[in-house]
Amino acid sequence: MSGSDYLQNILIRKACCSETERLNQYNLVKGRLMPIINQWSNGYLEEVFQSGSSAKGTAIKGKSDVDVFISIKSSCDVTLQKIYETLGEAVRQAGYNIRHQNVSIGLKVGNIDVDLVPGKKDPGNTNYHKLYVSKKQSWMQTNVKLQIQNIKNSHRAKFIQLTKIWRDCHRLAFPSMNIELIVLEALRGYSYDTSLTDGFLQVLRYIEDKILDSYLIDPGNSGNIISDDMTFQDKLAVQQKARNSLSQQYWSSVVW
């Protein structure tokens, strides 16, 4: 079996379902949760749309299956923290077990893992939103639709998925958005037909060479420095694992 065949089998086994299946899951979740969201939002709901890795086509098994972005109108005078907290409480009162995450509320709808991400839309004709960041008890501004389009237009989903799987195999603290942006930088100028082995090796080489001083900017807001989400120790651990992976003789020792 060639290296690319091995990596393709990993993707078949661990990457998430097709775009049609993801959309079907999203519509099922949306149908179950919209009555709760509509009542909670009290007339201030702007829109709801699929977001995160499920919308980007980069999801892997074992993580959130469906990400739902909940856009609240700019005219709502409730604070971002209150929006975040009351959404969680509304879902909990509806009978779901919830998890408070950094910018999202995690829950299960049947056997589907769901992340709900509430944000308040900026005034005017814009897709920019402000999100509550619970770990910092602060907020951030971003453009989720632009983030999604940036990844979908890159045609690098398979390499992003492989890098996520590699991260999980080695239990690294390597946030998904960092992975997305590093893969895009690593493969800048490479053909879309680049083989899985050549492309993934280039990603690992880039991580080894660049991650310690990488400067990754949120495509949805240049003021958000995504690389700051990792500590130096986390970056060092990822760099060392990339170096170790590049020294392995067999792909089965790198990702499985």
Where would I find each of the regions flagged by the language model?
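Conserved catalytic core of two-metal-ion nucleotidyltransferases
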Residues: 37-40, 62, 84-125
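Conserved nucleotidyltransferase catalytic core and NTase-mimicking acidic/glycine-rich helix/loop elements
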Residues: 157-256
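A broadly used, surface-exposed interaction patch
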Residues: 69-89
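Generic non-transmembrane alpha-helical segments
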Residues: 32-43, 86-94, 162, 166, ...
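N-terminal regions immediately upstream of nucleotidyltransferase
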Residues: 1-49, 53-63, 76-78
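Extracellular/secreted glycoprotein ectodomains characterized by long, lumenal stretches
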Residues: 3, 49-50, 55, 60, ...
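Glycine- and acidic-residue-rich phosphate-binding/metal-coordinating active-site segment common to enzymes
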Residues: 100-101, 110-161
